C-alpha cells in the first residue's frame, strides 16, 4: 500500500551559486504534477532582508509579486510558470523574516523566559514556516538558497536535517545540485568538487539521496558510478542537468533520465504515468516556430542585467509560443536613447516595450521611445512605469503641456500628470508599503483591452506608488487617450490605449507575473501578434528587420 502522507523534497546546492536550483525545483514540480500529484514549492533565502522588495535589481534581479502582495524571490516565478501551484508570501521565507518572527515572539513572552537560541527556536520557526506553506499538498519541494558551506545557510540546513526525523524518514528526500566542471587542458570532467560538496553537506548531518550534476556535456555511466561510490548515493539516483537551449526543455530532459520515476519510487508515492505532450509541443514552438521571428525592443534601465526582467522576458516568449513565432529581444539602455536618439537605436524593430522601473535616470529616454512608437505607428506596450511615461509623453506631445512630468521625477512640475497615490502620502517606510498584489480592473467595452481579455473585469498584480493624476483625466481623454481600464473601487487609471494606432497599450499592473507557457497572457499574445503584422508590413514596404 503506497503512502499518501505529505512528502518533502529538499533541494540544496553546492560548489558554486547560480547552478539552477530554482529551475531544477520547478522541473521536479512540473514532472510530479504531470503524474497527478498536488505540489507546492517553497524558497528559503538566507539573506537578512525581510524580503527582496528594497534590494537593487542589479544585486537581486527581479522581485516577483504574488497575488497576496508578497515581494518574493524570482524563483517563485519559475515555480508558477512550470506548475499550477499558486504562490503566496508563505512560499518565500528569508533569514530576516524568520529572525523577526522569533524576536517578536520573545518580546511577547512566548518563550516563557527561556534563552532564545538558533537551536531550537530559529530552526523550529523555519520548520513551522515550511509546514504552514505545505497545506494539503501531496509533495512539498523546498529550495534552500545559497551554497552549502555559507554561514548564512546553516540554520536552514539544520532545520531541514531535523525535518527527516520530525515527519519520518520515508517522507523526506534530499536532492543536492552540484557542478561537474570540464577541464579543457586535461580533457576531463572532474568529480572532486562534487565529492567535497557532498562531504560538506554530510558534515552538517545531511546525506543526499539524489544528486543532480550540472554539466555542459554528456557524462558516461562510469563517471556516474564513481560519483555514486564516493558520495554514498545509489547510482540510480545520480542525474545530470545539462545545458539546454530553453529552460522549458529541462523537465523533458530530467524525465528522459527517469528522475520523476525514481523520486516516486524512493518516496513510495502512487502516481500515474506522466503526460508530457504539452511540454513537447512547447519545445517544438520554441525551437522550430512556423512563422519566423520578430524583433522586440525593451527600453529600460536594467538592461545590463536581464534577470531584472525575468518574468517579462518569459512572458514575451510565451507570446511568441501563442503566435508560433520566435521572439528576439533587443535590450536598449534608456539612457543611451536620451544621448543618441530613438531613431538611431529603435529603427527596424517590430515592436517597443517600456517596462517598470524606479528612479529618474533614463526616464527621458523612455519618453523618447514612447514618442517614437506613437509617431511611427510601431506597436507599443508600456508596463507600470511604462504606462506613466506614455501618459507623460502624450501630455507633452499631444496636449501641449511641455513641462508635464511625474512627481516622482520632478516635484516642482507645473503639470503633474502622474502623482503619488493618496494612500502613499504619509508612508515613511520603504519595505512592503507600495500598492502590492492583486486588484480588480474594469475594462471599457469595445476597447482593445476588452477585446484581448474577453472579460469585463480582470484581476492583475501591482507594485507601485504612483498613479495617473485623475485631475488630468478629462483633458487626456478629450485629446484622444483612451482610458480602457480603471480600478472600480478607487477609479484609478489601470489601462490606456490609442484608438488611432495599430497597437498602443499601457497597463499600471504587471501582467508578466501571470503568464505561463501553456497559458500566455493575452496582452503579450496580442503584442506579439501586432509585432508580426508590423514585421510583415515592413517587409512589404521593403524594410528589413535586422
From Swiss-Prot:
Residues given in the record as CTP binding sites: 17, 150-152, 190-195, 226
Annotated binding of L-glutamine, by residue: 357, 385-388, 408, 465
Single GO term (MF): glutaminase activity
Any one GO biological process: pyrimidine nucleobase biosynthetic process
Source organism superkingdom: Bacteria
Gene Ontology terms: cellular component: cytosol
Domain Glutamine amidotransferase type-1: from-to ranges: 295-537
Pathway: Pyrimidine metabolism; CTP biosynthesis via de novo pathway; CTP from UDP: step 2/2
Sequence segments annotated as region (Amidoligase domain): 1-269
Activity control, per UniProt: Allosterically activated by GTP, when glutamine is the substrate; GTP has no effect on the reaction when ammonia is the substrate. The allosteric effector GTP functions by stabilizing the protein conformation that binds the tetrahedral intermediate(s) formed during glutamine hydrolysis. Inhibited by the product CTP, via allosteric rather than competitive inhibition.
Enzyme class per UniProt: ligase
Keywords: ATP-binding, Glutamine amidotransferase, Ligase, Magnesium, Metal-binding, Nucleotide-binding, Pyrimidine biosynthesis
Residues that bind UTP: 17, 190-195, 226
Reactions it catalyzes: UTP + L-glutamine + ATP + H2O = CTP + L-glutamate + ADP + phosphate + 2 H(+); L-glutamine + H2O = L-glutamate + NH4(+); UTP + NH4(+) + ATP = CTP + ADP + phosphate + 2 H(+)
Binding site residues for ATP: 18-23, 75
Disulfide bonds: none
Transmembrane region(s): none
PANTHER family in alphabetical order: CTP SYNTHASE, CTP SYNTHASE-RELATED
Family classification: Belongs to the CTP synthase family.
Quaternary state and interactors: Homotetramer.
Protein name: CTP synthase
Record organism: Myxococcus xanthus (strain DK1622)
Lineage of source species: Bacteria, Pseudomonadati, Myxococcota, Myxococcia, Myxococcales
Gene: pyrG
Amino acid at each position: 500500500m503506497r503512502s499518501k502522507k505529505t512528502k518533502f523534497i529538499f533541494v540544496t546546492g553546492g560548489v558554486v551559486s547560480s547552478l539552477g536550483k530554482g529551475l531544477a525545483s520547478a522541473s521536479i514540480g512540473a514532472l510530479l504534477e504531470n503524474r497527478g500529484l498536488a505540489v507546492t514549492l517553497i524558497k528559503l533565502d538566507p539573506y537578512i532582508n525581510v524580503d527582496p522588495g528594497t534590494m537593487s535589481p542589479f544585486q537581486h534581479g527581479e522581485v516577483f509579486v504574488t497575488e497576496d502582495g508578497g515581494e518574493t524571490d524570482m524563483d517563485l516565478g519559475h515555480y508558477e510558470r512550470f506548475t499550477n501551484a499558486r504562490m503566496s508570501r508563505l512560499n518565500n521565507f528569508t533569514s530576516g523574516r524568520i529572525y523577526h518572527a522569533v524576536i517578536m515572539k520573545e518580546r511577547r513572552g512566548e518563550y516563557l523566559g527561556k534563552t532564545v537560541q538558533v537551536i531550537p527556536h530559529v530552526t523550529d520557526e523555519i520548520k513551522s514556516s515550511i509546514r504552514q506553506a505545505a497545506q494539503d499538498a501531496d509533495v512539498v519541494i523546498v529550495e534552500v538558497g545559497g551554497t552549502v558551506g555559507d554561514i548564512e545557510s546553516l540554520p536552514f540546513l539544520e532545520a531541514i536535517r531535523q525535518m527527516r526525523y520530525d515527519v519520518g524518514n520515508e517522507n523526506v528526500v534530499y536532492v543536492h545540485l552540484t557542478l561537474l566542471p570540464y577541464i579543457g587542458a586535461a580533457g576531463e570532467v572532474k568529480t572532486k568538487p562534487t565529492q567535497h560538496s557532498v562531504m560538506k553537506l554530510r558534515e552538517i548531518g545531511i546525506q543526499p539521496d539524489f544528486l543532480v550534476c550540472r554539466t555542459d556535456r554528456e557524462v558516461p555511466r562510469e563517471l556516474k558510478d564513481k560519483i555514486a561510490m564516493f558520495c554514498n548515493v545509489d547510482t540510480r539516483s545520480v542525474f545530470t542537468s545539462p545545458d539546454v537551449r530553453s529552460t522549458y526543455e529541462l523537465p523533458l530532459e530530467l524525465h528522459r533520465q527517469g528522475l520523476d520515476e525514481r523520486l516516486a519510487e524512493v518516496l513510495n508515492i502512487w502516481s500515474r504515468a506522466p503526460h508530457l505532450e504539452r511540454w513537447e509541443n512547447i519545445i517544438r514552438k520554441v525551437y522550430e516556430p512556423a512563422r519566423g521571428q520578430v524583433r522586440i525592443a525593451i527600453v529600460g534601465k536594467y538592461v545590463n542585467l536581464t534577470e531584472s526582467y525575468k518574468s517579462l522576458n518569459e512572458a514575451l516568449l510565451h507570446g511568441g509560443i501563442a503566435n508560433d513565432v520566435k521572439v528576439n529581444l533587443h535590450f536598449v539602455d534608456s539612457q543611451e536613447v536620451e544621448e543618441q536618439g530613438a531613431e538611431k537605436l529603435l529603427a527596424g524593430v517590430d515592436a517597443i516595450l517600456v517596462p517598470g522601473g524606479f528612479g529618474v535616470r533614463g526616464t527621458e529616454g523612455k519618453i523618447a521611445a514612447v514618442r517614437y512608437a506613437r509617431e511611427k505607428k510601431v506597436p507599443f506596450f508600456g508596463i507600470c512605469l511604462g504606462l506613466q511615461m506614455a501618459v507623460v509623453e502624450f501630455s507633452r506631445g499631444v496636449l501641449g503641456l511641455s513641462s508635464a512630468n511625474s512627481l516622482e521625477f520632478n516635484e516642482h512640475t507645473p503639470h503633474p500628470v502622474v502623482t503619488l497615490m493618496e494612500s502613499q502620502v504619509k508612508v515613511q517606510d520603504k519595505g512592503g508599503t507600495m500598492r502590492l498584489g492583486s486588484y480588480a480592473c474594469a475594462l471599457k467595452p469595445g476597447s482593445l483591452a476588452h477585446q484581448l481579455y474577453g472579460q469585463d473585469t480582470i484581476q492583475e498584480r501591482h507594485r507601485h506608488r504612483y498613479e495617473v493624476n485623475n485631475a488630468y483625466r478629462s483633458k487626456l481623454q478629450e485629446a484622444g487617450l483612451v482610458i480602457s481600464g480603471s480600478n472600480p473601487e478607487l477609479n484609478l487609471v489601470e489601462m490606456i490605449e490609442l484608438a488611432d494606432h495599430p497597437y498602443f497599450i499601457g497597463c499600471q499592473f504587471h501582467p508578466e507575473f501571470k503568464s505561463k507557457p501553456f497559458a500566455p497572457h493575452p496582452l503579450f499574445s496580442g503584442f506579439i501578434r501586432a509585432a508580426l503584422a508590423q514585421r510583415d508590413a515592413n517587409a512589404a514596404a521593403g524594410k528589413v528587420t535586422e
